Curated annotation (Swiss-Prot):
Residues annotated for [2Fe-2S] cluster binding in this entry: 178, 187, 190, 192
InterPro entries: Anamorsin, CIAPIN1, SAM-dependent_MTases_sf
Function: Component of the cytosolic iron-sulfur (Fe-S) protein assembly (CIA) machinery. Required for the maturation of extramitochondrial Fe-S proteins. Part of an electron transfer chain functioning in an early step of cytosolic Fe-S biogenesis, facilitating the de novo assembly of a [4Fe-4S] cluster on the cytosolic Fe-S scaffold complex. Electrons are transferred from NADPH via a FAD- and FMN-containing diflavin oxidoreductase.
GO biological process, one term: iron-sulfur cluster assembly
Cofactor (UniProt): [2Fe-2S] cluster; [4Fe-4S] cluster
Coiled-coil spans in chain: none
Protein name per Swiss-Prot or TrEMBL: Anamorsin homolog
Notes on the domains: The C-terminal domain binds 2 Fe-S clusters but is otherwise mostly in an intrinsically disordered conformation.
Species: Acyrthosiphon pisum (Pea aphid)
Sample GO molecular function, one term: 2 iron, 2 sulfur cluster binding
Amino acid sequence: MSDRKNVLFVVGKSSAVKELEEFASCNADRANVKIEIVENIGLATDGPLYSAILSGFGADDNVSCDLNLLPTYTTLLTAGGTLIAKTDVGTEDALVKRMKLCGFLNVAKSESVPGVVVGNMPTYKVGSSDKVTLNPEMKENVVSAWKLDDNNSETISEDDLLEADDLIKPDSSSLRVCATTKKAKACKDCSCGLAEELEANRLKDTPKPDTSNAKSSCGSCYLGDAFRCASCPYLGMPAFRPGEKVQLAGNLLQDDF
């Protein structure tokens, strides 16, 4: 305890105060010793002042370290301060666990004195901040890893990605779409003229059948539809004279829709 550190003794009986005062006077050149009874320790308002706290070491003290006092000890100890607590033999593990939960570090049972547990406060204060120093060489290596060597990179021409069919311009007729559906298919009630245009293109591409040698099997075709059968090639045409040459339409036997 060099440099006259502040030490706090916590005892359970007032009878132990006198003996500890004699100890304090003998070591006054080494430490500032203060003695408190356990009933009064909760009233202490000294703040983080003590470098070490010894609890339950009075000669006539039969009271073990009160676990409920540990949070108070953390407020009285300075950063890195030491708590030496005495408890009943066999209950050291419970004290070790409670001290760890209160934030003490390096908590361990004494190997020389049974029933004694020692722990240290962290070297930092709650809410304190510290500067984090980064390795500049590591940062430079990370940046250089993403640099590209232009000499080794291969570029692909955009024209090489196109096929021969991609270079052909589409016909304007194939781009015609319905004003309603925006598709190259006429809607049911098409009024934009796409249906008529598609029908005209279909009829244009449909080969016309040869009807020059068409003959009637019943002999009544020239009389009109009233005398024609259901499969008559002249169905729907006006009556004509017998033997007259009639040119049939190219959409014969095809649906009107």
